[in-house]
Amino acid sequence: MWRSVIAGCGSYLPANKVTNANLAERVETTDAWIRERTGILVRHFAAEGEKTSDLAMAAARAALADAGVDAAEVDLIVLATATPDQTFPATATRVQAGLGCRPGAPAFDIQAVCSGFLYALSVADALIKAGQARTALVIGAETFSRILDFTDRTTCVLFGDGAGAVVLRATPSTGDGGERGILSTHLHADGRHHDLLYVDGGPSSTGTVGHLRMQGREVFRHAVTNLYEVVLEALAANGLQADAIDWVVPHQANQRILDGTAKKLGIDPAKVISTIALHANTSAASVPLALCEARRDGRIQPGQLILLEAMGGGFTWGSALVRL
């Protein structure tokens, strides 16, 4: 039996920083209004001509270097994005070619919006456990600045661009309860709520790219409930209590959602990794970005139990319990 171990982690943020004050020059808002409602101070926007694949490749190169793995060893790429370079081919194929990964190995995109990285991680984990891959790149990358409506102050202030990636390595499972790797993943969706968070465009509907639309109050209500339940599901599946978790790495949607979920679970807020202030909501990139930052600054250490969780449009939501 194979187990997927996170061997390396990497991230990338575009150089262009956009502060709340910058946005206040473009839309009717203030720095105080954004801070109080979201916790966001700054976000990064991709430069003109900088594509999702460029962000993804930068994060992937950093992850490969961190893992000490050559790109030629990668035999699977799963890329989570809601903002692909093109309708097709998959952005993952451009990443595969750009990195010099092995031709012929599978590379594909997954679209579950802000839950996308957890969906991608779960799929890659399943393929490794099935013996169909040995070294996988799992990437979350977004250029959400391209689909924002800068006349809608309730949404355009929330999002940023970025990418995060992890390298998964197949490792023989010993059956030891303390071994490293992905211990469990849980995925969910409820399409009845697809019209609460969506983009009002698409090739088969309007023939346009469209802009992001969101009913924020309803999304908040569902997010706290769904994330609470999926965390309990992960704990129950592994026979654990909440105090066994060393760190929670949530999707960075809004500081209020992070705080509300932690309070409902009875988890110490100090155990919750928050990068929302400096990254904003980067959709599928937010979980790996936060994971990599906390690992890089020394908060997350080898052997610790890490709970990843996210919810996105659809609705989609999920969790992954990992021992690093």
From Swiss-Prot:
Keywords: Acyltransferase, Cytoplasm, Fatty acid biosynthesis, Fatty acid metabolism, Lipid biosynthesis, Lipid metabolism, Multifunctional enzyme, Transferase. It is found in: Cytoplasm. The keyword Ribosomal protein does not apply. GO terms for molecular function: 3-oxoacyl-[acyl-carrier-protein] synthase activity; beta-ketoacyl-acyl-carrier-protein synthase III activity. Pathway: Lipid metabolism; fatty acid biosynthesis. The keyword Lipoprotein does not apply. It catalyses: malonyl-[ACP] + acetyl-CoA + H(+) = 3-oxobutanoyl-[ACP] + CO2 + CoA. It comes from the Bacteria. GO terms for cellular component: cytoplasm. The last Arg residue of the ACP-binding site is essential for the weak association between ACP/AcpP and FabH. This is Beta-ketoacyl-[acyl-carrier-protein] synthase III. It comes from Rhodospirillum rubrum (strain ATCC 11170 / ATH 1.1.1 / DSM 467 / LMG 4362 / NCIMB 8255 / S1). The gene is fabH.
